Amino acid sequence: MYSKVKSLGISGMEAFAVTVECDISSGLPRFDVVGLPDTVVKESRERVRSTIKNCKLEFPLSRITVNIAPADIKKEGALYDLPVLIAILKSSGQIKENVDDYAFIGELALDGEIRSARGILPMIMSAKEQGLNKVFVPEENAYEGSVVDGVEVYPASHIKDVLLHIKNEKPIKAVKYNFDEEVKYEYNIDFSDVKGQDQAKRALEIAAAGGHNCLLIGPPGSGKSMLAKRLPTILPDMTFEEKLETSKVYSIAGKIPKGKSLVSKRPFRSPHHTVSAQALTGGGANPKPGEISLAHNGVMFMDEFPEFDRRAKESLRQPLEDGVVTVSRTAGTFTYPSSIMLVAAMNPCPCGYFGHPSKPCTCSDAAKKRYKDKVSGPLLDRIDIHVEVSPVEYDELSNNSESEKSRDIKKRVDKAREIQRKRFEGTDITCNAKMTPKITKECCVLSEEADNLLHESFDSFAMSARAYDKILRLARTIADLAESKEIKLEHIAEALQFRTLDRKYWDE
């Protein structure tokens, strides 16, 4: 007897419709799974067989063929256990009710318990697009899936619960997402914790206001990491669309905590400098998002930047420029979102004390050159703001007066972002850092004095076209913070000062 059951699958960042077909025919007992399954999917035969036996159901002693379509897409993971079991029960006549209105997702334990699966959110979003409005998911993932309006998400903890619902003996109540329960995330760190470092704080305020990448250069203990960790506290609150995008990435990576639905705060990722290029960009045998994508709509902090593997550093080029990372593997080509703010931190030399007012540098010129050469020119070009973080003076540390709080800086950032939102209304651009060269030219109107200064600087600093555009975007953000429609002399001057450190450290 033939039956088919609906399910869903994940390939890269996208979900797709899956049909699990089952045919039970006469012949020697045999259980085959076809349809380009991976090893885990093939192993579902034993999980399904044991579950049927342990739940006092009848396993057909016939020839069983299960096809997981479409056959041209590789199926990965154990999430097909539940639909395979339902298809077998349907084919063997143990389920007589119509299940065409339902889709089934979930891994089975041998006792019939339904375990969590990754990628539930994008799969439910895909179900809605395909007109599927009833989906059984593991209980642990139900709240995550309930975010999608228009789809009834049924939490299932055991196969018996699913069967009782199908037979209408004990209906399961669909989970409803309560938007009123969303709470604003409160940070337990604040910019006021950082003593001194006014220039670095100003640089991070500009970075937050325009979505710019930033490089912090300074000796050990100057507060680079402390500053970077506080950057999310002044970033604008995430919109619902941003929460959905970010949660989709985290869902596919299997990083949404049990009982949670949306990622409500801006991600902050801080990979160790020994991380591989693949761990940064994503991919692998079973492709998953990497650190860059896990920082989507948030901040990725790379401390000890020169110490990262060169391939790992250079793999940042495309994501920083395009906002996406494309990974090509044998299984196919996958594109992951990576709209991030990069904050990189480094010492000025291997010992860390080049230019220090009191501690002498012990590095040779050759050692300093080798250290700085670990960061390539094209990568530096993609970082908008270069700021020197000087050692904190005793007077600043001992000063008991309270520094400006994150909430006050955030108000200015929010105001600048609102100006940008209105400016880019009707486009895909979200902030000044994402402006195309054409839009940069249209939106960056310079006063005569500002234009003259930029012209002189372009010639004397031998700027690239990319660096020129980045200075304009940076000046546009500074002008937005000052609520000025025109980019004035002081805005260009401040933007230029954040682009001169590469001359000091790399061209000396």
Regions found by a protein language model. Give the residues of each.
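Short beta-strand elements
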Residues: 18-24, 280, 384-387
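The Walker A (P-loop) glycine that initiates the GxxxxGKT/S ATP-binding motif of P-loop NTPases
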Residues: 218, 282, 304
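Conserved alpha-helical scaffold flanking the Walker A/P-loop in AAA+ ATPase domains
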Residues: 205, 261-262, 266-267, 277-300, ...
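Walker B catalytic acidic pair
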Residues: 297, 303-304, 315
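Residues immediately C-terminal
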Residues: 110, 300-301, 307-308
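Peripheral, non-AAA+ core regions of ATP-driven protein-machinery
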Residues: 1-215, 219-225, 468, 485-508
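Basic, amphipathic alpha-helical bundle interface domains used for macromolecular binding and assembly
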Residues: 40-45, 60, 67-77, 286-287, ...
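Walker A/P-loop
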Residues: 216-257
